[in-house]
């Protein structure tokens, strides 16, 4: 067996995976996203500062 044939055996055939198996599997990367008050204020400040900086381009 050549090196190409060995690599071919290790690959997963995507056509053999059914859609129901993909949907039923839980997402291992699912994490809770936290938005506390400090992050909210930093985000609002960032949006306000960017709005002030780009207002000259918008209202020109």
From Swiss-Prot:
Keywords from UniProt, A to Z, are: Chloroplast, Membrane, Photosynthesis, Photosystem II, Plastid, Reaction center, Thylakoid, Transmembrane, Transmembrane helix
Q: Is this entry keyworded Chloroplast?
A: yes
* Keyword Amino-acid biosynthesis on entry: no
Spans through the membrane: 39-59
Membrane topology classification? Single-pass membrane protein
Q: Where in the cell is it found?
A: Plastid, Chloroplast thylakoid membrane
Q: Which Pfam families match?
A: PsbL
Q: Which InterPro entries match?
A: PSII_PsbL, PSII_PsbL_sf
Q: What is this protein called?
A: Photosystem II reaction center protein L
């Amino acid at each position: 067996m050549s090196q190409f044939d060995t690599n071919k055996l290790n690959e997963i055939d995507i056509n053999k995976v059914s859609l129901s198996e993909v949907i039923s599997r839980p997402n291992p990367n699912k994490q809770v996203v936290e938005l506390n008050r400090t992050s909210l204020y930093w985000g609002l400040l960032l949006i306000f500062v960017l709005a002030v900086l780009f207002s000259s381009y918008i209202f020109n």
